[in-house]
């Protein structure tokens, strides 16, 4: 059984690696983005509430996000483990995830932290923006996103480091090489 988080800066390849690792480990990859989209598409009560915030250009509050994650982690397919991407993003969400898992009688096994040099990430994200025609993703905007990530995520990583469950892996290199580094790190 593997219950894990994948954390890393924008452009580090979390989504790509989450899909590959979950397939190898035989556990579902769960991204908060997917949870939001599914709830909105299915017009669940939580989905309608989230959509009211996003339509107004506001961030969805923790209470709604937490409930969506709580609901998703109650599904049968996660009984053998999961790989969670995009949550928790704050120490308050760490505490909520602890409560959710405790209520299910389980805990986290590992927090996979993908690391990468910021200049490399900027280059990668600028290339992605160009491919996707996202003219709003300028270098300044990307660097700001990386700064926000650092500020928000450092305390989250700190909590899990104190618990001794963080595994750091360099997220740069070919997709296959990064996957192999992750699998090797998880086997230690």
Swiss-Prot record:
User: Where is region (NMP) located?
Assistant: 31-60
Domain of life, per UniProt, equals Bacteria
Where does it live in the cell? Cytoplasm
Which cellular component terms (GO) are annotated to the entry?
cytoplasm
The positions annotated for binding AMP are 32, 37, 58-60, 86-89, 93, 134, 145
GO terms, biological process = AMP salvage
The record's similarity note reads: Belongs to the adenylate kinase family.
The free-text domain note is: Consists of three domains, a large central CORE domain and two small peripheral domains, NMPbind and LID, which undergo movements during catalysis. The LID domain closes over the site of phosphoryl transfer upon ATP binding. Assembling and dissambling the active center during each catalytic cycle provides an effective means to prevent ATP hydrolysis.
What protein does this entry describe?
Adenylate kinase
Organism of origin is Kocuria rhizophila (strain ATCC 9341 / DSM 348 / NBRC 103217 / DC2201)
């Amino acid at each position: 059984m593997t219950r894990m988080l994948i954390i890393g800066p924008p452009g580090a390849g979390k989504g790509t690696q989450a899909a590959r690792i979950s397939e190898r480990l035989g556990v579902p990859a769960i991204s908060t983005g997917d949870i939001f989209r599914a709830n909105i598409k299915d017009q669940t009560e939580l989905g309608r509430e989230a959509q009211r915030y996003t339509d107004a250009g506001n961030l969805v509050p923790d209470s709604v996000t937490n409930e969506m994650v709580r609901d998703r982690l109650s599904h049968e397919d996660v009984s053998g483990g999961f790989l969670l991407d995009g949550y928790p993003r704050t120490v308050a969400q760490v505490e909520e995830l602890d409560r959710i898992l405790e209520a299910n009688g389980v805990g986290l096994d590992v927090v996979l932290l993908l690391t990468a040099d910021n200049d490399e990430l900027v280059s990668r994200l600028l290339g992605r923006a160009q491919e996707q025609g996202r003219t709003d993703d300028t270098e300044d905007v990307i660097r700001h996103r990386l700064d926000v990530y650092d500020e928000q995520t450092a305390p989250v990583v700190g909590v899990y480091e104190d618990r001794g469950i963080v595994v750091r892996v360099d997220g740069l290199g070919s997709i296959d090489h990064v996957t192999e580094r992750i699998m090797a790190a998880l086997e230690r």
